[in-house]
């Protein structure tokens, strides 16, 4: 009879539906080398997750529904890809395996070209995206479509100068009127209200190269009102690189916006070894109180569309006009002359590599 209370207790614990003791955490990653992103040296420890949030870091006691043994591995915050062209690829496959498996958890989109706006003349010219009907006209509309489709990565985007410019100007090389600049400013304002980080430009080739410094300043003043920033693929990465960096600095100065220079480099071999001078330009601007920075990529190659090697004048009127010019023997002769000899103010990939075609690789594969 003395054993009855114990027996009753065991039976009670075995009755289906009895409440179980809840784990302290959903997940604990144990024994990894923790690099916390603050600049501190790495340390061995655990990371506990509860309700999709980091709940504890260090030597974590307690239980978890799932545990991962990270011995010999690095545990770090998700990486941010600050220059991504996955805007439309994420709509095709939101799993983003190529990024997730590298530890990338956030992608920054919209460099020069963005997923919106598609207004006015640009909307009429670009009814399809990667062969599918485009379902939106604004950057906010794109965000809504992406939300519905779902994605494994966090996403943020700039509004691209090319979209803004072509929405108003189409394929024209004409100078915009004051009224058209005002229309562009309204599109930038709309995108900023939709959640854009700021304005991003690609002013090395049309249509972005059609914008003057004053044009970009006018649009960046709208960005400044929303606390955004200006990110730029500068106008020239060759022998005009110093002037191009100064232009980016001046835009930040006049518009009152932080500036980020994208993949800063000196591509023309005649100027190799002079990067310290550009660093001095940037440091001088920072000493002045301007908020300016630059980023680089860790390899000695660049990538661009093949059309970037064709002189700017040949792009006027859009792709169909360009194809017509390419079919014209006299126009091709003029293009060849300009490619081989250069045009003042135009960054020329061919002359930048020492007029050596063997240093240029042409690929038909989709690269991003």
Q: How should these model regions be labeled?
A:
Residues 32, 47, 52, 72, ...:
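Divalent metal-coordination and catalytic microenvironments
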Residues 18-22:
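Sec/Tat signal peptide C-region and signal peptidase I cleavage site
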Residues 5-17:
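Bacterial N-terminal signal peptides
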Residues 213-232, 255:
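Alpha-helix-loop-beta-strand connector modules within alpha/beta enzyme cores
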Residues 62, 67-137:
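Metal-associated gating/positioning segment near the N- to mid-region
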Residues 79-89, 201, 230-236:
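Histidine-centered catalytic micro-motifs
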Residues 23-27, 34-78, 93:
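Histidine-rich, glycine-flanked metal-binding segment
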């Amino acid at each position: 009879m003395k054993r009855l209370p114990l027996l009753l207790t065991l039976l009670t614990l075995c009755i289906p539906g009895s409440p179980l003791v809840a784990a302290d955490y959903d997940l604990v990653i144990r024994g990894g080398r923790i690099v916390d992103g603050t600049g501190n040296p790495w340390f061995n420890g655990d990371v506990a997750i509860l309700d999709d949030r980091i709940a504890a870091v260090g030597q974590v006691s307690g239980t978890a529904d799932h545990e991962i043994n990270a011995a010999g591995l690095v545990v770090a915050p998700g990486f941010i890809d600050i220059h991504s062209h996955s805007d439309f690829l994420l709509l095709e496959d939101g799993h983003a395996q190529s990024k997730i498996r590298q530890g990338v958890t956030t992608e920054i989109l919209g460099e020069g070209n963005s997923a919106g706006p598609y207004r006015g003349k640009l909307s009429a010219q670009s009814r399809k995206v990667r062969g599918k009907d485009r379902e939106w006209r604004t950057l906010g509309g794109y965000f809504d479509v992406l939300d519905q489709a779902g994605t494994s990565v966090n996403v943020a985007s700039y509004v691209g100068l090319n979209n803004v410019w072509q929405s108003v100007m189409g394929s024209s090389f004409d100078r915009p009127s004051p009224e058209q600049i005002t229309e562009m400013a309204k599109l930038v304002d709309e995108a900023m209200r939709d959640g854009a980080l700021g304005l991003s430009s690609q002013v090395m080739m049309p249509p972005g190269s059609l914008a003057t410094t004053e044009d970009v300043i006018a649009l960046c003043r709208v960005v400044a009102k929303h606390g955004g920033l200006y990110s730029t693929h500068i106008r020239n990465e060759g022998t005009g690189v110093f002037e191009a960096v100064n232009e980016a600095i001046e835009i930040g100065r006049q518009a009152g916006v932080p500036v980020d220079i994208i993949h800063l480099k000196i591509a023309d071999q005649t100027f190799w070894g002079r990067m310290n001078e550009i660093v001095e330009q940037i440091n001088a601007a920072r000493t002045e109180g301007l908020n300016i920075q630059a980023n680089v990529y860790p390899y000695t190659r660049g990538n661009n569309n093949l059309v970037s090697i064709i002189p700017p004048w040949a792009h006027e009127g859009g792709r169909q006009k360009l194809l017509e010019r390419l079919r014209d023997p006299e126009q091709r002769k003029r293009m060849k002359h300009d490619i081989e000899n250069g045009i003042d103010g135009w960054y020329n990939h061919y002359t930048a590599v020492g007029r050596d075609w063997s240093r240029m690789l042409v690929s038909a594969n989709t690269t991003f």
